[in-house]
Amino acid sequence: MEAHKGKQDIFIVQVLITPTFVELNHIYPPIRLLSPPSISSNPSIKFDKTQAPPTLFIYIASYNTPDYQTTLHKSTMLHVRAAASSLREYLTPVSNTSTFRTTGEITPDEFVKAGDYLVEKFPTWSWASASKSKVRDFLPPDKQVLVTRHVPSHVRASTVSGPVTLGEEEDGWTSFGVANTKDADGDDTEEIAEIADSDFEELDDDDDDAAEAPATATDHRTYNLYIAYSTSYRVPKMFLSGYSPEGSPLTPEDMFEDIIPEYRDKTVTIERPTFQDNITMVAIHPCKHANVMRVLMERVEAKGDKDITRGVAKLGVADADDGEGEEEWEEVENSAMRVDQYLVTFLKFIASVTPGIEHDYTMSAL
């Protein structure tokens, strides 16, 4: 702070943590809360537990701001959002009440059932334990997170025929995926329905085009993908850890290139995972997952569609029973999707966000 000259104003940035998204608002005009000498003796973050929903107030110093506005760097915003997400995860109690059918949310027990099903049917996925300090007591010690490793990526998301849309309408997945100021139960729900209505045919066409595009050695990347359980949103949460052709960890900025632009800009965070120490990963924020899953399940029931994975080529799984090399996936035995089949549909959903990651690899890649 000694490096700065001139007048100092303190701004409050309000981080409103809701069940739907994290909203960042600047409060104007600035409020002179603390004099410079007293800043170091006061906490920089306050949390008011009496608020519902919880609200964080973060003090940010701003110098020489005659227009009484301050602009936070994009990376700062990402870290603020990640910090808010981590705090919300820590503070939210675990729910064991099943609302799978009505909300699209699942309990920890249902997450384990869905993970067992995924591992049994698609053996490129496996359960893993967590770092000692990160063990979550509401999950079995050896089933803290699901992981699949060495998933190749040869093209960046922006080169897969531009923004990925999943329906025939103008508004597709990309506009839905942004956590903005829309009413969470209004326009977004209609857009989710468009996604669920589609058979992901356009996504498959894009994948075929991408496969024909020449890729150089420098384009090749590999990913370890992790599915953890989010207590704050009561849904699975996807973490990505990428590596260069030389095996060096990718920076968050590099990994952003493999997530569709409209999604990465608003609902992707850089954070320490809930299951591992001393590492930073990119996480796909789960604020919309429950709504997507609920609508997808409703569409499965309405159509009586027995094949919940029809038309999806890139899910990071290899079926142990698939001997013909075709994209034949587990069928739903009844018109209603079972809770243990939840993660298969979840991965169908995630595949649209990371179209450049080639999940259709074989066991020989391990």
Curated annotation (Swiss-Prot):
GO biological process, one term: protein targeting to membrane
MF (Gene Ontology): Atg8-family conjugating enzyme activity; Atg8-family ligase activity
Gene Ontology CC entries for this record: cytosol; mitochondrion; phagophore; phagophore assembly site
Region (Handle region), start-end ranges: 291-341
Signal sequence segment: none
Catalytic residue list: 287
Cell compartment(s), UniProt: Cytoplasm
Pfam families: Autophagy_act_C
Disulfide-bonded cysteines: none
Keywords: Autophagy, Cytoplasm, Protein transport, Transport, Ubl conjugation pathway
Location of the region described as Flexible region in the Swiss-Prot/TrEMBL record: 160-217
Keyword presence, Ribonucleoprotein: no
Subunit structure: Monomer. Interacts with ATG8 through an intermediate thioester bond through the C-terminal Gly of ATG8. Also interacts with the 40 amino acid C-terminal region of the E1-like ATG7 enzyme. Also interacts with the ATG12-ATG5 conjugate.
Role: E2 conjugating enzyme required for the cytoplasm to vacuole transport (Cvt) and autophagy. Required for selective autophagic degradation of the nucleus (nucleophagy) as well as for mitophagy which contributes to regulate mitochondrial quantity and quality by eliminating the mitochondria to a basal level to fulfill cellular energy requirements and preventing excess ROS production. Responsible for the E2-like covalent binding of phosphatidylethanolamine to the C-terminal Gly of ATG8.
Comment on protein domains: The N-terminal region is involved in phosphatidylethanolamine-binding and is required for ATG8-PE conjugation.
Family: Belongs to the ATG3 family.
Protein name per UniProt: Autophagy-related protein 3
Annotated organism of origin: Yarrowia lipolytica (strain CLIB 122 / E 150) (Yeast)
